[in-house]
From Swiss-Prot:
Subunit structure, as described in the record: Component of the PAF1 complex, which at least consists of cdc73, paf1, leo1, ctr9 and rtf1. The PAF1 complex interacts with PHF5A. Interacts with ctr9.
One GO molecular-function entry: chromatin binding
Function: Component of the PAF1 complex (PAF1C) which has multiple functions during transcription by RNA polymerase II. PAF1C associates with RNA polymerase II, is involved in transcriptional elongation and in histone modifications including methylation on histone H3 'Lys-4' (H3K4me3). PAF1C seems to be required for multiple steps in cardiac formation. Involved in the migration of myocardial precursors to the midline and the differentiation of the atrioventricular boundary in the developing heart.
Record field: compositional bias (Acidic residues): 375-385, 404-430, 453-473
Coiled-coil stretches: 352-381
Positions of region (Disordered): 1-23, 360-503
Protein name (record): RNA polymerase II-associated factor 1 homolog
UniProt organism field: Danio rerio
Subcellular location: Nucleus
Record keywords, A-Z: Coiled coil, Nucleus, Transcription, Transcription regulation
């Protein structure tokens, strides 16, 4: 075929058309290709056919030491595909007000069970082994019977059967039997873990209530940061924190806050001397503490909403493990210093130790009685007292009708009896009143408990007034006791004179 010859106009037209192209075509050949003859497509799909001959029959390739020692470069990104912004922490913070995609909301939906009260659902819940489960039945069966195939149901079958077979805590006898069974189970030796057979105990210690320290109410104080002083070494800081005190205070604006006091050097020496001499404190000794931090406080006790019981354990050498109750939880957060407000960094707390007063001893006895649970119910005691008084009055009524010849003696007894009855009634009323006070102290209201917690944790400023009142009450009580003793002595003298007259 004869070659074609392009004119100058055709070349210019070709250049104009190629100028409008965005991506120019590149060819591996330097000269212009006049003819293109591309290979046709393969008429059939590729197939994998096993090669029947040995691959190493012509040549056996063996890598040289140069290839083995060559270290190939790992062309990977420096962050390995995990982009983490270490400068701005807000990069990965999730906005709680963001709207979820409707497709993702299904992941947060709870599994809603189909209503099982209908007759149709009850029929589909039945498993019929001899019936062939076709496809249109299986979908319907899975819809109604999915609750029977859950793992939770399979695991809880044995527990459910155990509770249905044994009716525990049904009546008083079963409760007593269950309580006695706990004591029997406690006597059994522990050989292995209840759920991990391969775990064996290293040491077994008995656990008891802490009868020694239960009379003192304990509180858990949680700091938002370490309150240790920064300018003191770690061992010395621990010693200072072991002697630290917290106290409620009020600023000039009337805002309450908690002050954290640390002992000064003189107080540390005094406390160290007390420990060496095995003394709780030295009488008439003054201990000074300097304020270290100021906190805002939040208190939760048994009367607070959402309160959770909290206990702690005490390990005593060769004596066992004892647990005690943390009935108050105090959270302390740092208090921001206000601009222009007078700082209280120079505040000093001066402490003197004293013996417990009668009110504090009664509170300790109430806590001890609450632990021992030896207080009988007040209603039963009142009923018993009423029965005893009725029986005594019935016997007194029957005595005059026994004999008519002893009229003078019965008259004398009736004259003597009202005084004794009055004394017995007064004693009974005092005992009932004392029990009611004990019960009221045991079941105090939320406000009283909160006030008591604040007084126990942060102290009271009315100690001196209470001591003066107690001294006055003690003197009055001693005077009343002496007068009652004289009155009883005079009564005994009158009784002896009456007896001699009757003889």
């Amino acid at each position: 075929m004869a070659p074609t010859i392009q004119t100058q106009a055709q070349r210019e037209d070709g250049h104009r058309s190629s100028a409008h192209r965005t991506v120019p075509e590149r060819s591996g050949v330097v000269c212009r290709v006049k003819y293109g003859n591309s290979l046709p497509d393969i008429p059939f799909d590729p197939k994998f056919i096993t090669y029947p001959f040995d691959q190493h029959r012509f040549v056996q390739y063996k890598a040289t030491s140069l290839e083995k020692q060559h270290k190939h470069e790992l062309l990977t990104e420096p962050d390995l595909g995990v982009t983490i912004d270490l400068i701005n922490p807000d990069t990965y913070r999730i906005d709680p007000n963001i709207l979820l995609d409707p497709a993702d909301e299904k992941l947060l939906e709870e599994e809603i069970q189909a209503p099982s009260s209908s007759k149709r659902s009850q029929q589909h819940a039945k498993v019929v082994p001899w019936m062939r489960k076709t496809e249109y039945i299986s979908t319907e069966f899975n819809r109604y019977g999915v609750s029977n195939e859950k793992v939770e149901v399979k695991i809880g079958v044995s527990v459910k059967q155990q509770f249905t077979e044994e009716e525990i805590y049904k009546d008083r006898d079963s409760q007593i039997a269950a309580i006695e069974k706990t004591f029997e189970d406690a006597q059994k030796s522990i050989s292995q873990h209840y759920s991990k057979p391969r775990v064996t105990p290293v040491e077994v210690l008995p656990v008891f209530p802490d009868f020694k320290m239960w009379i003192n109410p304990c509180a858990q104080v949680i700091f938002d940061s370490d309150p240790a002083p920064k300018d003191v070494s770690a061992p010395a800081g621990v010693d200072m924190m072991s002697q630290a005190m917290i106290r409620g205070m009020m600023d000039e604006e009337g805002n309450q806050f908690v002050a954290y006091f640390l002992p000064n050097e003189d107080t540390m020496r005094k406390r160290k001397r007390d420990v060496e001499e095995e003394l709780d404190y030295m009488p008439e000794e003054v201990y000074e503490y300097k304020i270290a931090r100021e906190y805002n406080w939040n208190v939760k006790n048994k009367a607070s909403k959402g309160y959770e019981e909290n206990y702690f354990f005490i390990f005593r050498d060769a004596d066992g493990v004892y647990y005690n109750e943390l009935e108050t939880r105090v959270r302390l957060s740092k208090r921001r210093a206000k601009v222009g407000a007078q700082s209280s960094t120079n505040a000093v707390l001066v402490c003197k130790h004293r013996d417990m007063n009668e009110k504090e001893l009664e509170a300790q006895e109430a806590r001890k009685a609450q632990l021992e649970n030896h207080e009988p119910e007040d209603e039963e005691e009142e009923l018993d007292l009423e029965k005893d008084m009725q029986e005594d009055s019935g016997e007194e009524r029957e005595k005059p009708s026994d004999s008519e010849n002893s009229e003078s003696e019965s008259e004398r007894e009736e004259e003597e009896r009202p005084a004794d009855e009055d004394e017995e009634e007064e004693e009974d009323e005092e005992s009932v009143k004392r029990r009611r006070e004990r019960k009221s102290s045991g079941s105090e209201s939320g406000d009283d408990r909160q006030a008591r917690d604040e007084e126990e944790i942060f102290g009271s400023d009315d100690d001196s007034e209470e001591e003066e009142e107690e001294e006055e009450e003690g003197g009055a009580r001693r005077r009343s006791n002496s007068s009652s003793v004289q009155h009883s002595a005079s009564e005994r003298a009158s009784d002896s004179s009456d007896a001699s007259d009757s003889d």
